[in-house]
Amino acid sequence: MSKHKLIILRHGEGQWNKENRFCSWVDQKLNNDGLEEARNCGRQLKALNFEFDLVFTSILNRSIHTAWLILEELGQEWVPVESSWRLNERHYGALIGLNREKMALNHGEEQVRLWRRSYNVTPPPIEESHPYFHEIYSDRRYKVCDVPLDQLPRSESLKDVLERLLPYWKERIAPEILKGKSILISAHGNSSRALLKHLEGISDEDIINITLPTGVPILLELDENLRAVGPHQFLGNQEAIQAAIKKVDDQGKVKQGKQ
């Protein structure tokens, strides 16, 4: 029996999403389409009469800005927003900044799919010579995390994402839900997938088939033990959502004529 409702979403589109590049921990802002996606998400939640008590985000701009725009559309700007690196996007290591389609050309579509969607496969780690290494690790936000800078990841599998996310879920988010508070989590594709895997009991093998489009609210109904009652539900125009999911899936494929 459903006792709690939780809204999770992947942030609105950023420029690197549009350019089909691995964004990861690079702090890209929302582009114009992403701004509209976030506002539309807020409008959908308003139409469904959602009222939030607390919002959780990563410490990346695109996650935070999406949450702000949603709250603005809801007229709930006063709702507290808490940010943690533990909700950050998956760290894609040496793949950061690279184009997914070009990677598929060079390494094959299946390898790129494993890097993007599998549970256990970890991309090569980021090195200090990487063009975005210092932009990430010199940023002040990573010097005030709950782990030392030298213990932050240099690359992650989805399994790693879940392992760093779960303590925050159990210690900070879950207790608020159990108090009866209405929670919104504005996160990223892979931190959201990791959380869905945990709450829905999705297998290591099946998680590769879960794809989340940008800027679409996801409803999870949870029981008294915070386990999902039924599968997650995308809120909005289902035909448009399925088209958006296919678009995300196709990012790691080589377009016809280039093979």
From Swiss-Prot:
Q: Which SUPFAM superfamilies match?
A: Phosphoglycerate mutase-like
Cite a single GO BP annotation. Answer: glycolytic process
- Enzyme active site: 11, 89
Q: Where is this site: Transition state stabilizer?
A: 188
* Superkingdom, taxonomy of origin: Eukaryota
Which GO terms label this protein's molecular function in UniProt?
A: bisphosphoglycerate mutase activity; hydrolase activity; phosphoglycerate mutase activity
Q: Positions modified as N-acetylserine?
A: 2
Q: Which reaction does it catalyse?
A: (2R)-3-phospho-glyceroyl phosphate = (2R)-2,3-bisphosphoglycerate + H(+); (2R)-2-phosphoglycerate = (2R)-3-phosphoglycerate
**UniProt binding sites for substrate:** 10-17, 23-24, 62, 89-92, 100, 116-117, 189-190
Record comment: activity regulation: At alkaline pH BPGM favors the synthase reaction; however, at lower pH the phosphatase reaction is dominant. Inhibited by citrate.
- UniProt keywords, alphabetically: Acetylation, Glycolysis, Hydrolase, Isomerase, Phosphoprotein
* Chain positions with Phosphothreonine modification: 122
Please give the InterPro entries that the UniProt record associates with this protein: His_Pase_superF_clade-1, His_PPase_superfam, PG/BPGM_mutase_AS, Phosphogly_mut1
Query: Looking at its record, which EC class is this enzyme?
Result: isomerase
Q: Where are the transmembrane segments?
A: none
According to its UniProt record, in which tissues is this protein expressed?
Answer: Expressed in red blood cells. Expressed in placenta (labyrinthine trophoblasts).
- What's the EC number here? 5.4.2.4, 5.4.2.11
Q: How does it assemble?
A: Homodimer.
Q: What does this protein do?
A: Plays a major role in regulating hemoglobin oxygen affinity by controlling the levels of its allosteric effector 2,3-bisphosphoglycerate (2,3-BPG). Also exhibits mutase (EC 5.4.2.11) activity.
Q: Which family does it belong to?
A: Belongs to the phosphoglycerate mutase family. BPG-dependent PGAM subfamily.
Q: What is the name of this protein?
A: Bisphosphoglycerate mutase
Q: Which organism does this record belong to?
A: Mus musculus (Mouse)
